[in-house]
């Protein structure tokens, strides 16, 4: 099974992540940021990953460091757990609607980190969660996993719905791209490496 455990401690945050890519969607998320916990839970549930995230951060300052650093550690965990990437499907695009919102996530587990982000969010906060940190999370995740990630709003206005659809879509897209396909012999690249 493809699993990883990653710890990271800085002067701003202390984060622990356990990941099983081949899980059933169980989760235990505790970041101190209620809305972010909800998003990571949805990500795990819909991606069918078993995920544990325990994070302590300088929330008295703001949520930025915690959200970004969870992205760093989670991306690192996916990189470790995905191993040599032999026989993975590699690419995926997934659309997720939530009421009026429709979000598309496309990704390539390529070893080439990149983020294209186009989620215009009207509200500055959802609960104590600062919405500008959504982009920081996706960037940290993509760059530490080493994937090309596109996250786009096709339509929608409700900030909660847009963010929720994006986390669900990321989970679904990763589930598909990380699936093993017996027809793929070795690394899914003509270069021979990812």
Curated annotation (Swiss-Prot):
Please list the GO terms describing molecular function.
imidazoleglycerol-phosphate dehydratase activity
Q: Where is this protein localized, as stated in its record?
A: Cytoplasm
According to UniProt, the name of this protein is: Imidazoleglycerol-phosphate dehydratase
- Tell me the keywords, alphabetical order: Amino-acid biosynthesis, Cytoplasm, Histidine biosynthesis, Lyase
Pfam families assigned to the protein according to its UniProt record, in alphabetical order:
IGPD
* Major localization class: cytoplasm
Where does the record place a coiled coil? none
CDD domains for this protein = IGPD
Choose one Gene Ontology CC annotation of this protein and give it. cytoplasm
Q: In which pathway does it act?
A: Amino-acid biosynthesis; L-histidine biosynthesis; L-histidine from 5-phospho-alpha-D-ribose 1-diphosphate: step 6/9
Identify its protein family: Belongs to the imidazoleglycerol-phosphate dehydratase family.
| Biological process annotations from GO | L-histidine biosynthetic process
The top EC class is: lyase
Q: Which reaction does it catalyse?
A: D-erythro-1-(imidazol-4-yl)glycerol 3-phosphate = 3-(imidazol-4-yl)-2-oxopropyl phosphate + H2O
Q: What is its EC number?
A: 4.2.1.19
Q: Which InterPro entries match?
A: IGPD_sf, ImidazoleglycerolP_deHydtase, ImidazoleglycerP_deHydtase_CS, Ribosomal_Su5_D2-typ_SF
